[in-house]
């Protein structure tokens, strides 16, 4: 019995040593990367790469299936695209420049060779842990608006931050559309999910959450701006901005209330539904539509 136990012990030690040796050889010969390349789901490298395109680009077409998208202003008059390359096969970005139009896309999940369930499970864990590197950052040319921007983004959060977005059509199926510190002009942004927008100038644009709620805070309205939500809609403006513009608000099944930030615990004032103002010589109008409640919150004007 002792000999049998000792035999199993020796066998275990030997196989463990051999396993470590094979693992070391695999790492040295890029065997791990070869295995990761078989993953059906994207596995991203931690290093970042950048593509740059010049003034010859006037139109931008973006379609992303596997990457989260961030849009911001470039530091110069060129387009900068930053991303983490994919270790796994067939998940990298693809760019194509035709005349004055730049197209950017990635590929949908590819078919992978048959692997055991254990290896597939391991690759799934590795893929999930690398998702923090799945973002693509688009830097738009500073001070030089493009003629047209068409964007389709289907994963994660879509972020527009410190950006000047003009002549754009954006459709995103990610879980959140977040806009902050930006200028949106002559554009239409649509998502089935949540919209959060902060400290942003809106000019002649439409933003819509088809199936969820919408939160807008400290926005500036220029021209005709439309905000639409399936669920509740919250709009927070300074007193000065609220009094400066015309309103056209209606809720299909909810009510419209007006609150002040100084008394958040109050029940607010219920407004007529629809609620509309027609101030003479005022061309800036905020149109708000929702199937649920609409809350208008007024804050003290900044000095």
Task: Please report, for each region that a protein language model flagged, where it lies by residue.
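Generic beta-strand structural signal
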Residues: 64, 95-97, 221, 251
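N-terminal Lys/Arg-rich, disordered targeting/topogenic segments
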Residues: 1-5
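Ser/Thr/Pro/Gly-rich low-complexity linker/stalk segments immediately outside membranes or between
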Residues: 27-49
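Hydrophobic membrane-insertion alpha-helices, especially the h-region
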Residues: 6-27
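Right-handed parallel beta-helix
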Residues: 47-59, 68-72, 94-187, 195-199, ...
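Short, surface-exposed interaction patches in beta-rich subdomains
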Residues: 187-303
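N-terminal beta-strand/beta-hairpin edge segment
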Residues: 64-91, 136, 140
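Short, solvent-exposed secondary-structure boundary motifs
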Residues: 39-44, 60-63, 79-90, 127-129, ...
């Amino acid at each position: 019995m002792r000999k049998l136990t000792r035999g199993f012990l020796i066998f275990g030690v030997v196989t463990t040593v051999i396993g470590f040796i094979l693992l070391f050889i695999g790492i040295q010969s890029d065997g791990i990367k070869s295995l990761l390349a078989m993953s059906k789901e994207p596995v991203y490298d931690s290093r970042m790469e950048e593509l740059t395109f010049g003034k010859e680009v006037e139109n931008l077409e973006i379609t992303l299936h596997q990457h989260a998208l961030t849009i911001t202003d470039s530091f110069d008059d060129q387009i900068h695209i930053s991303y983490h390359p994919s270790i796994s096969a067939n998940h990298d970005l693809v760019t194509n420049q035709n005349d004055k139009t730049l197209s950017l896309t990635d590929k949908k999940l590819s078919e992978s060779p048959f692997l055991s369930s254990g290896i597939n499970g391991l690759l799934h864990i590795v893929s999930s842990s690398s998702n923090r590197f799945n973002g693509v950052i688009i830097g738009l040319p500073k001070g030089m608006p493009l003629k047209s921007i068409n964007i389709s983004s289907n994963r994660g959060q879509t972020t527009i931050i410190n950006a000047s977005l003009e002549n754009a059509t954006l459709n995103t199926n990610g879980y959140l559309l977040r806009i902050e510190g930006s200028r949106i002009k002559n554009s239409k942004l649509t998502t089935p999910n949540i919209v959060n927008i902060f400290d942003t100038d809106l000019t002649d644009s439409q933003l819509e959450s088809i199936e969820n709620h919408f939160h807008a805070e400290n926005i500036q309205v220029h021209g005709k701006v439309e905000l639409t939500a399936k669920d509740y809609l919250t709009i927070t403006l300074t007193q000065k901005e609220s009094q400066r513009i015309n309103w056209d608000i209606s809720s299909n099944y909810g009510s419209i209330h007006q609150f002040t930030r100084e008394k958040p615990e109050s029940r607010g004032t219920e407004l007529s539904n629809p609620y509309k103002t027609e101030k003479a010589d005022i061309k800036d109008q905020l149109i708000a539509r929702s199937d649920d409640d609409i809350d208008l919150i007024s804050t003290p004007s900044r000095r």
